[in-house]
Amino acid sequence: KEAYSLNCNYEIINVDMNNIISNEAEATLLIGDDALFSYHNRQADLFYYDIGAEWKVLTGLPMVYAVWVVNNEAKLDKADLKFAHDKIVQGFKDGFNNKNLAIESVLNKVSFTSEQISEYLKVLNWDFTAKHKEALLKFYELAYNNGLIDKMPKIEFVEVE
């Protein structure tokens, strides 16, 4: 809001990828496969902004796109939490070690080439550093200050050993 001097209304809709901006909207925020598809199939009359790059310019911080979340009860069972954490970490390792096989396994389910998927995986950042934590808290602060969320979430980080 402050950065672009805009007062936006947000609405969740299904997007027609051949007509990204509906007649009722002035802009569309795409995430996930829709964003990647749009990146590789740009429509000439539209402007495209990488939300992560814009966030970095505006805040100086990295964008946090996803986090692993557990409820308060899960943190009490350290053994189960460690088991789940280890499985996730091993899954990432297996995926990276077998990247080409993993890519081939989804090619018939997505609208991307193996090269596009491989390039996408190279630019993802899988770390969660102190800067990422700061960025996530800044995101929530701005969302709250702009009336997008009713209250600031209390975020608690659990160490998994």
Per-region residue spans from a language model:
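Pocket-lining segment of extracytoplasmic ligand-binding domains
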Residues: 13-105
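A basic- and aromatic-enriched beta-loop-alpha substructure that forms the phosphate/nucleotide-
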Residues: 1-8
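Long, low-complexity C-terminal extensions of enzymes
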Residues: 144-161
